Amino acid sequence: MAHKKGTGSTRNGRDSNSKRLGVKAYGGEKVTAGSILIRQRGTSFLPGINVGKGKDDTLFALKEGTVSFESIKRNLRNRKRVNVVI
């Protein structure tokens, strides 16, 4: 017989660090070349004029300018395109 009650264990207690995804530069903001505009998983936002796409789908400015967003219809799914206007 146990003198004290044994404590159970749980299979919880883990949580991943947040990945800080989302829009980093909004429409109308001035950005420099190389600035990160959007961090994303997949292509919710598509690269437009003067915008490049990294291997993790991050969008970044190729030239200095002002950020602008436009809505496009593609494959029955509304997407947004990000441009950097000089």
Curated annotation (Swiss-Prot):
Pfam families associated with the record: Ribosomal_L27
InterPro entries (alphabetical): Ribosomal_bL27, Ribosomal_bL27_CS
Keywords: Ribonucleoprotein, Ribosomal protein
Stretch list, region Disordered: 1-24
GO molecular function, one term: structural constituent of ribosome
GO CC aspect terms: cytosolic large ribosomal subunit
Domain of life, source organism: Bacteria
Family: Belongs to the bacterial ribosomal protein bL27 family.
Designated name of the protein: Large ribosomal subunit protein bL27
Organism lineage string: Bacteria, Bacillati, Cyanobacteriota, Cyanophyceae, Synechococcales
